[in-house]
Amino acid sequence: MGSRNSSSAGSGSLEPSEGLSRRGAGLRRSEEEEEEDEDVDLAQVLAYLLRRGQVRLVQGGGAANLQLIQALSDSEEEHDSAWDGRLGDRYNPPVDATPDTRELEYNEIKTRVELATGRLGLGRTAQEHSFPRMLHQRERGLCHRGSFSLGEQSRVMSHFLPNDLSFTDTYSQKAFCGIYSKDGQIFMSACQDQTIRLYDCRYGRFHKFKSIKARDVGWSVLDVAFTPDGNHFLYSSWSDYIHICSIYGEGDTHTALDLRPDERRFAVFSIAVSSDGREVLGGANDGCLYVFDREQNRRTLQIESHEDDVNAVAFADISSQILFSGGDDAICKVWDRRTMREDDPKPVGALAGHQDGITFIDSKGDARYLISNSKDQTIKLWDIRRFSSREGMEASRLAATQQNWDYRWQQVPKKAWKKLKLPGDSSLMTYRGHGVLHTLIRCRFSPAHSTGQQFIYSGCSTGKVVVYDLLSGHIVKKLTNHKACVRDVSWHPFEEKIVSSSWDGSLRLWQYRQAEYFQDDMTESDRNRVCSSGPAPVPCPSVAFSSPQ
């Protein structure tokens, strides 16, 4: 799975891309038209493949000796480049100083977030939102039942966002994936060294307790997921199989789920598991969605979903009936699992507005809202009650096909810095200020329990973790320490902790630390230490809120 094909450009023996039937949907013609316009079609095919990064022209020993090098995918290529993910350090993503919030003002998500963070009905003054004022109200017995509501607890926690590096684990190769389990007790990390590492996160710890060698890995593990019961995890790679492995027990029990693809070079870029653990959803480089039934132990669906790589899949909520997919055609599609058929692959709707391929999708978990990260250097917030028109879909497709740069090894063109809204863009909000280069960088909603999902956070090609306020669109926090792009980020479901996974070969845990002391809060030994060595950050006293069982 790790090879690339090369052929002489002058020999006329160029092999067509094996995924071209799906990638070049706009180039399909009848056999009669192909015979009449063969030369034109070949030129269009070559231009398309060069533009999308599927092939590259490489000069050999002489000026006339040109070779076509076939790359595996526009999204995750199966070899390491010289820049090693550090090109993005030279790119300073433009920050949107005045985000357009007009669509959000009249959408229900604004009310939902304000309710979840205890801000509904409050004014806009800083005093009304201040932490001291909330404590004063509680002391006076003005809070509901004498204590903070769940929304007020989330508002309190918003004052203690992670800001300090508390733990680092270093690997010999790039870290690709890193996620917390649903209960926050385990963190799973996947690295290019084909090793999956599991960390015990109970009782405030972050201790590695198991390392598992992944099987049938081409280039790297590309995505991971936990099963709902928390006893197994799944991973995908450049392989025909999605693997499932046990977490507990002495041995490692691996089971291969055969997707039986039509492509010879095949990769699953994104995976998701249904809430009952029965079905596994995958998005692949052949433009298809795959559904594998674990009870029947077979692939049950192969849906032609996108015109290019499917980079992202997600279930909309716990029912697992509605699902989302996003691809390099810049379109996010919404599917109903109950009506999905191979002979009639029609989504229930589409969301258009991105100008380049989608790298990741995260659902808010309410079967209505989702966010998508894109190579156009933006995150967009969507409401599935606002599907895009045909005009919007055509505008996004056209913008994506007109991109003439490759995000894997080229700098972002200046035209992509412009704040431009495509005709028919149905998104509620656009977030700018992070970089999406080199790889499929992830973005996610912050947890509901501790933050009321009032934030969106993303990895960044400049080695940062960027946290946005969902309603204002402004950046509220940047975590900076990595030396290469941050591909994955994961926020603990109940605690103010964020873990970043980077191509610099490190995993980093971020927590809140108080930067200033108040004399009344310090012991005599603390005062002596500060006077002798200067101020140093100390752990913030934990704000103890109960978590659901």
Curated annotation (Swiss-Prot):
Spans annotated as Disordered: 1-40, 80-100
Composition bias type Basic and acidic residues, residue spans: 80-89
Pathways involved: Protein modification; protein ubiquitination
Keywords, sorted A to Z: Phosphoprotein, Repeat, Ubl conjugation pathway, WD repeat
Disulfide bonds: none
One Pfam family in the UniProt entry: WD40
Sequence positions bearing Phosphoserine: 73, 75
GO cellular component terms, semicolon-separated: Cul4-RING E3 ubiquitin ligase complex; nucleoplasm
WD repeat extents: 170-210, 216-258, 263-302, 305-345, 353-392, 435-480, 481-520
Comp. bias (Low complexity): 1-24
Biological function: May function as a substrate receptor for CUL4-DDB1 E3 ubiquitin-protein ligase complex.
Stated name of the protein: DDB1- and CUL4-associated factor 11
Organism of this sequence: Rattus norvegicus (Rat)
Gene: Dcaf11
